[in-house]
Regions:
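Charged, glycine/proline-rich intrinsically disordered loops and linkers
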Residues: 69-92
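Short, solvent-exposed, charged loop/turn and helix-capping segments
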Residues: 52-76
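Short acidic/histidine-centered micro-motifs embedded in hydrophobic/aromatic stretches
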Residues: 42, 63, 133
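Short terminal interaction segments
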Residues: 84-147
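Long, hydrophobic N-terminal alpha-helical segment
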Residues: 1-52
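A structural signal for well-ordered alpha-helices, especially hydrophobic packing surfaces
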Residues: 15, 19-22, 26, 47-54, ...
């Protein structure tokens, strides 16, 4: 159980970093010059690490006896759990960390959706400006020969 708790603690740290990066991405999306490459790359690295934590947790869970495996799988489902089902402090800690992970994922997801909406809106505005410029010109070709 200690290894699973360590993985969940690591996952909370990584998800916190993802959430913080997503906040920065959202702020950057509102600026005139949107440069997100380094943020997206770093967030991708953290997401890969979270996936590794998930795989290790699954492996460690599979290595448990069948009854413990079923019980722990239920606890890790990220659903509201009756703490009376937890038979040890370790299980209560696992529930707490699992719920913390779910909360961080939800927050990061909301910010990500917001950033995407901002970028989509900006893209639509730019398309509209380009279309207006094209209509204002007699020649719809944006790239005129100046020779």
């Amino acid at each position: 159980m200690d290894e699973i708790i360590a993985c969940l603690e690591q996952k909370v740290l990584l998800l916190t970093k993802i959430w913080n990066l997503t906040k920065q991405i959202q702020v950057r999306c509102t600026q005139e010059e949107v440069e997100l490459d380094q943020f997206l790359d770093l967030r991708g690295v953290y997401i890969e690490r979270v996936n590794k934590c998930n795989k290790l947790i699954q492996k460690l869970t599979r290595d448990l006896p069948a009854d413990q495996q079923k019980h722990l799988t239920h606890i890790l489902q990220q659903e509201p759990i009756d703490e009376k089902l937890c038979v040890s402090d370790e299980e209560r800690q696992i529930v707490k960390l699992t719920l913390n992970c779910a909360d961080l994922l939800q927050k990061a997801g909301q910010l990500d959706r917001s950033a995407r909406e901002i970028l989509t809106h900006q893209c639509e505005e730019l398309k509209e400006k380009i279309n207006q410029l094209r209509k204002a010109e007699k020649n719809p070709n944006l790239y005129r020969d100046t020779v």
